[in-house]
Amino acid sequence: MVSSEPKGPANVANTASPLKAHESSGKRANGQKFKPGGAGGARKFDKFGGGAGKSFVKPGAGGAKKFDKSGPGGFKKFDKSGATGDKRLGGNKFRGKPQTQPQAPAEGEKQDWNKFKKEKKDLKLKRKSAKDTYEISKEANQIHEKLRCRRTENKDKLVEQIYKVLNVGDTISKVVKAHDTARVIQSMLKYASPALRAEISEKLLPFTVEMCQSKYAQFCVQRMLKYGAPATKAKLVDSLYGHIVRLAGHSIGSGLLDSMYQSATPNQRIYMRQEFYGDLYRKAKDSNVKTLSDTYKEATNMKASILGSVKANLDHVANKQLVDSALVHAVMLEYLRACDEDEEKLEETVTAFAALVPHMLSTKEGSEAAVICFYKSTPKNRRAIIKNIKEHLLKIANHEHGHVFLISLLNALDDTKATKKAIYDHLHGDLKALMSSPYGRRVIQWLVAPGDTTCFHPEFIRTVEEGLAFGKKEKELRRKEILEQIEAPIAQSIAEDAAFWLSNSHIGLVTGDILNHIQGESYEKAASALAQVVVQPEWRISADAAGPQPQDKKKPHNDVEAIIAQATKQRRKLLYVESSSDDEDEDEDEDEESDDEGDEKEQKEAAADDAEPKVKKAKKEPKKPKAKEEEPAAPLVSGIEEAGMHIVLKKILKNDGKREGTPFSQQLLQNLSSDVLKAWLGVNRACFVLLKLVEECPALLDDCKKAIAAERSLSQILADRKTPGAKLLAAKLDIGK
């Protein structure tokens, strides 16, 4: 408020006098402070005085006006506590409205738990019945109970009944996200006729994006992918356009997106990848853009912005740790190839994906992208990548695409000691598991025979050796150092269980490569153990050298109904065989359940009358699940007669002529007993093995002659045999002339 007193020198003197007094006396004892005020006088701040609070004194025409927090003229108080005045005592804005929770018992009163449970159950039922789809869902679930029964026939008729119930407005789109009715939709998609399945799918297609992000509706999308016709699957992929990047970063949708990408047509895959290139391609697709480089082929000035968009989308997916997807792997590979010149962006991307390399090795594109990440990363990032794959080394080595990354890593590292410590030492304890896998064997072969064209395809060798440009050490020196460090542990493993290393022809080929490359004591230790296995009279190997047959990679037949019908026929045959025994078991189970219910009632009545309850009948022990039929073991054949092992032995003997000391051929001949030699002379392939032995090691020719001539029967057997191997061996040893 403006003062009415005239402004002048006297007024200035009045305002200055308290200031002088303050300067002379300093602070007062009661803690009051004075500061110069405005033109109208002094402003007083009573902070520590005896007043009730902070007061502001301001002169005006009608006298001093005070602003105080407390007192009759203070601030207005708002009562937020409710009707009781205190929120802690139960006052709230919902007072007077019906309570949704059962009332708690009064103090000192015992809780009636049966009543409490009943009230909770009634409340739950009341909440459910308030929904507009409650009655429809209830009826659909009742029919579904019959549909899901294994013995129910004409299931397609029941599906039609459920569809009539649910086909009211947008009911299907509502119930598909619920935990119970989502199972109903799944069964409908499974057992419906082709026409009805297509109709149900058409109803669900507009909500595909929402279903892919739903906890329960996602399984309906899986059913559409599994049982839907090719046209339905194509529409399913088309319905995701515009939301690909968002689904790729969703914890539930990423898995479904990966399944759809793998089942999509080539053009659909291109369109799905285009959405990672930027917002321009989310709604408008370009059939001329096949890869990322096509987007800026005609407008190079847009390259930086497009690569920035791709990087942002990849970083979003990497932050969610959802990179285990063929779609993400394909985009990642295109991006790494495109930003080869921009080292700054490349380094940022490599750093972001270094911890996620194990998840990138499930596809061919992901493995190639991981190799590029490793090649072009700094030493710090390389150590991080090696650290992250340590716990997954066995799985990576046995994987179709992961083993390529591991071989590329072994071929590019300069520090061979660190390579052995970080990689081979972790794999050494699982050598048998590696040798049992076709891809694990390739890792061992590369360690002992890197770049050998007899073991690896020239194109594979060329691809792996591209990493040599990112190392400093000479190729031959690096490979020699690795072999010197691992040959002793491998030889020790062979000596401990030589029979395994000759258990089939595929493992035997790798064993032969190992034996042909190791030197010195390691060779003699391994050769001695293997020779003792070969000369055993009961040496048997697995005839099924390839192990379990790989699954047929051909695309399944598109006629899903024929597949379902065939499976149903087989199931019915099994049901008819076991129908009588199952019916008897079910009758017994029903009798037991009714007896149990009657016994419980009797026990309650007896407890009320202080009587002893009747003894319950002993329940029938549940049937133990039948054990799955074990796959028949592969037949065993004589190792010396098996065609693949015959090649292995000849391969080992071929390099014995260059060896010094005691080669495998000499140890084989020394350990060969007369009984085994007699059996060998009657086998064509065994005769060729002996022929190869004396041809490659002429010094052993006389020893072989003496061994056969020691017993007249052996010479006679060899002379009487008419097989090609026996004839050539007899001619070489001058026997029978």
UniProtKB/Swiss-Prot annotation:
Check the record and name the Pfam families matching this protein: CPL, PUF_NOP9
GO terms classed as biological process: apposition of dorsal and ventral imaginal disc-derived wing surfaces; regulation of translation
Which is a Gene Ontology cellular component entry for this protein?
nucleolus
Q: Report residue spans for region: Disordered.
A: 1-128, 577-638
Domain PUM-HD, chain residue ranges per copy: 139-490
Which superkingdom does the taxonomy of this entry point to? Eukaryota
Q: Where are the Pumilio repeats?
A: 167-202, 203-238, 239-274, 388-425, 426-462
Keywords noted in UniProt: Repeat, RNA-binding
Q: What protein name does the entry list? A: Protein penguin
| Gene assigned in the entry | peng
